[in-house]
């Protein structure tokens, strides 16, 4: 299992959601409104103060998915959320040691 997190531009969410849902085996996602700024080293000195004090609205997507669909999900995010400018966002993938889906779990069956 993998956890895929992405920070994207809000305007990209509707199309991205549609494309992700068309992936066979797509498990669903959690979407949150967040704010962020680019790294200071990526900014010109003229824009640095404004960029560090004026956060930009973004969307964070979180997906827990089987390994088999991870690359398809990441590729779909890149293909549909990128505009080629600073501030496009970020994607990161981490290993999940264990995931317990509440609706599938029998009480007491998790080995606590």
Model feature map: region roles:
Residues 1-112:
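Positively charged, small/polar-rich N-terminal and surface patches that mediate targeting and assembly
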């Amino acid at each position: 299992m993998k956890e895929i997190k992405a920070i994207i531009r809000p305007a990209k969410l509707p199309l991205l959601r549609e494309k992700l849902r068309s992936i066979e085996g797509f498990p669903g996602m959690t979407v949150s409104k967040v704010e962020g700024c680019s790294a200071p080293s990526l900014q010109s000195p003229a824009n640095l103060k404004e960029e560090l004090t004026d956060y930009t609205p973004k969307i964070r997507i979180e997906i827990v998915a089987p390994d088999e669909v991870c690359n398809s999900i990441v590729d779909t995010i890149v293909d549909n959320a990128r505009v080629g400018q600073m501030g496009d966002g970020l994607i990161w993938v981490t290993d999940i040691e264990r995931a317990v889906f509440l609706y599938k779990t029998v009480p007491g069956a998790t080995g606590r």
